[in-house]
Structures are given as C-alpha cells and as structure tokens.
Curated annotation (Swiss-Prot):
The keyword Cytoplasm applies. InterPro entries: Aldolase_TIM, His_biosynth, HisA_bact_arch, Isoase_HisA-like, Isoase_HisA-like_bact, RibuloseP-bd_barrel. CDD domains: HisA (cd04732). This is 1-(5-phosphoribosyl)-5-[(5-phosphoribosylamino)methylideneamino] imidazole-4-carboxamide isomerase. It holds the Pfam family His_biosynth. GO terms for molecular function: 1-(5-phosphoribosyl)-5-[(5-phosphoribosylamino)methylideneamino]imidazole-4-carboxamide isomerase activity. The lineage of its organism: Bacteria, Pseudomonadati, Chlorobiota, Chlorobiia, Chlorobiales. Its main location: cytoplasm. Keywords: Amino-acid biosynthesis, Cytoplasm, Histidine biosynthesis, Isomerase. One of its GO terms (cellular component) is cytoplasm. It catalyses: 1-(5-phospho-beta-D-ribosyl)-5-[(5-phospho-beta-D-ribosylamino)methylideneamino]imidazole-4-carboxamide = 5-[(5-phospho-1-deoxy-D-ribulos-1-ylimino)methylamino]-1-(5-phospho-beta-D-ribosyl)imidazole-4-carboxamide. Pathway: Amino-acid biosynthesis; L-histidine biosynthesis; L-histidine from 5-phospho-alpha-D-ribose 1-diphosphate: step 4/9.
Length: 257
C-alpha cells in the first residue's frame, strides 16, 4: 500500500482543514516546500498537493510554491485544486508535476476530461471523486452531482481514465478512521485503480485498507494523522531530525541536483 502524504496550500502556507471547512484551518508550516522535504526525509514515495486557493477561485496563485516543491524533491508529485482547463493542466505538467487531478470539472465539464485523454497519458490525468453517502460533491463540496459516485467513475473510465482518487468527505480531517465500507463499495462497483482518502487516523486504518487491494485500492492519501504524528515510527524520525539532511544515509531520499 503506497502511503501518500498530503500538503494543502492556502495563502502560500501549508495548512490542514476539517471536512473542507476553511474556517477550521490550521497552519503547520509557512513554507510548503519545507513540509515536502520533511515528508521525503521520512521516505515518502509520492506527494499529494492541493491548491486550496485555486479550488476557490480557479486561479493558480500557488503555482510558484508547487514548482518549488517539485524542484526540491526527487519523487513524483500529484496536484489538484481548481483545475478547469487544458492550459492549467499543461502549466502543471510543464513544471514537472507527474499527475494532475481533475475534480469538479469531471462533473461540470466532462468534455475537458475527454480532451485531456486525447492529449496526455492515463498516468498523467486522474479524477478525484469526493463523495458523501455515495453522491459526488462538487464546487467546494457545496453542491451535489446528479449521479452516484461509481456512475461518475464508470463515465470517466469510458473516456480512458484509469485511476480515481476517492474521498469519503464525511471522514476527511475528522480523525475518526477511514471510510472502509464506502471505499469498498465504490471500488467494487467502479472496477478501477483507486487511491483512498479521508479519515486515516492510525496504522490500523492502513492495515484495514490492505484488505481492499483485491478491489483495486493500492494507495492512500494521509493528511492530518501524519501532521499530528499518529504513527509510532514518526517519533524516531523526529528524534533524529537535527541530524538528518535530505541526502543523509538515514533516508533513501536524495536532493535534486
């Protein structure tokens, strides 16, 4: 199971929200690139970045910060948040982002996905489905789609999408455990590669998700649980923090040259 640390960027800072509520914002670091390096030191193999400002406005105001992250780590970076055009996708891929996530636009403008799949490889474009009780939520989770989550996934599959990032928003940022049953139901019906998200609290959640591998769930995005140091191994990493540089043998990470 690939564990993907999440970095949410708001006003240029690394933050975490609770259930997507901007009024419940906690700032963890002023420089998101520093956060990326910390996760890489702890042997992250991929990073999940969300531009919260872009999600609100559609403007890529944090692209410089994201570019800095890409330049400073030697692992793939996937980016989502307010991506609504081919030009936006191109801009991210041009700075070295490995994978771009289409969210609300998959519902409001499915032709965008169709166009992107004619231009880019399936490995470069994924769709994020944020669902509540099986219904996709869009536009900052303020509106509901008129179809079920798995129905949206199957439409995307027909267009060539191979992977879905599936978030149970009732669990997101709540530290109440992964939405195991909702993720299982979705993965069974979609029949696609699935990255789970929302609610991971501790290692027991990760062990539970291992049971969903046969349904295509092969990775998980972890946010607040990592930031709140809910995993015992993090105590080891942080106890040696002053001695570990990005290119130190203690980590498999290597600084980009």
């Amino acid at each position: 199971m690939l564990i993907i640390p999440a970095i949410d960027i708001k006003d240029g800072k690394c933050v975490r929200l609770t259930r997507g509520d901007f009024s419940q914002k906690k700032i963890y670091l002023d420089n998101p690139s520093d956060m990326a390096i910390i996760w890489r030191k702890q042997n992250a193999k991929m990073l999940h970045i969300v531009d919260l400002d872009a999600a609100l406005t559609g403007e890529m105001v944090n692209i410089a910060a994201i570019s800095d992250i890409v330049a400073n780590v030697d692992i793939p970076v996937q980016v989502g948040g307010g991506i609504r055009s081919v030009d936006a996708v191109k801009s991210y891929l041009d700075i070295g982002v490995a994978r771009v996530i289409i969210g609300s636009a998959a519902v409001t403008n499915p032709k965008l996905v169709e166009e992107l799949m004619h231009i880019y490889r399936p490995s470069q474009i994924v769709v994020g489905i944020d669902a509540e009780n099986g219904v996709p939520k869009i536009k900052g989770w303020l509106e509901s789609a008129t179809m079920q989550d798995y129905e949206l996934a199957l439409r995307m599959k027909e267009m060539g999408i191979e992977r879905i990032i599936y978030t149970d928003i009732t669990r997101d940022g709540m530290m109440q455990g992964i939405g195991y049953e909702s993720t299982k139901r979705f993965a069974e019906k979609a029949g696609m590669k699935v990255t789970a998200s929302g609610g991971v609290t501790n290692s027991s959640d990760l062990h539970k998700l291992e049971g969903l591998r046969r349904y295509g769930v092969d990775s998980v995005i972890v946010g607040k649980a990592l930031y709140e140091c809910n995993f015992p191994c993090q105590e080891l990493w942080y106890s040696f923090e002053d001695e570990i540089s990005i290119d130190h043998n203690f980590s498999t990470a290597r600084q980009k040259s």
